[in-house]
UniProtKB/Swiss-Prot annotation:
One of its GO terms (molecular function) is CMP kinase activity. GO terms for cellular component: cytoplasm. GO terms for biological process: pyrimidine nucleotide metabolic process. It comes from Pyrococcus abyssi (strain GE5 / Orsay). The keyword Ligase does not apply. This is Cytidylate kinase.
Length: 181
């Protein structure tokens, strides 16, 4: 692994490839992979709730979102960490590299359908509804417009590249950053 201390955030909408990229980065560089989903599961366990119970609880308690985000910020104090989450780029203001992955909703729906074993149409509807709800929630909770990509250093349309191609693009950026630290 190159020398230095980097904090990288990877954000994107459902089916854009954030988890795949983060796993590849963690494996290649030995980065610690922190993701909001894991933090959320840990919090459910801490409260003795199933994931489903905790999701319903979190919908009624905005402090859960704030705690997930706080824990992501805390993780950013470590060296050589990749933090995955829709708001990670917004929350981890001092990240060395902020990445946004995107793809047309139809492509993302196909990926989610394959991953979850549902129809593309069902995945499309779930994604569209979730994105609308999340956008409202982020605006209300933080005043953040998730569609504002101006904070990102690197924006990649993952429909144009294989997972290996996306990794190669990001690897080139990280290797360049390591030359500077």
């Amino acid at each position: 692994m190159p020398k230095g201390c980097l904090v990288i955030t990877v954000s994107g909408l459902a089916g854009s490839g954030t988890t795949t990229l983060c796993r590849n980065l963690a494996k290649h560089y030995g980065f610690k992979h922190v993701y909001a989903g894991l933090i959320f599961r840990q919090m459910a366990k801490e409260r003795g709730m199933s994931l489903e119970e905790f999701q319903k609880y979190a919908e009624l308690h905005p402090e859960i979102d704030r705690e997930v985000d706080r824990r992501q910020v805390e993780a950013a104090k470590e060296c050589n960490v990749v933090i995955e989450g829709r708001l990670a780029g917004w929350m981890v203001k001092n990240a060395d590299l902020k990445i946004w992955l995107d793809a047309p909703i139809r492509v993302r729906a196909e990926r989610v359908a394959k991953r979850e074993g549902i129809s593309v149409e069902e995945a499309f509807m779930k994604i569209a509804e979730r994105e609308m709800q999340n956008r409202k929630r982020y605006l209300n909770l933080y005043g953040i417009d998730i569609n504002d990509l101006s904070i990102y250093d690197l924006i990649i349309d993952t429909s144009k590249w294989s997972p290996e191609g996306v990794f190669a693009i990001v690897k080139a950026a990280i290797d360049h950053l390591y030359e500077k630290v």
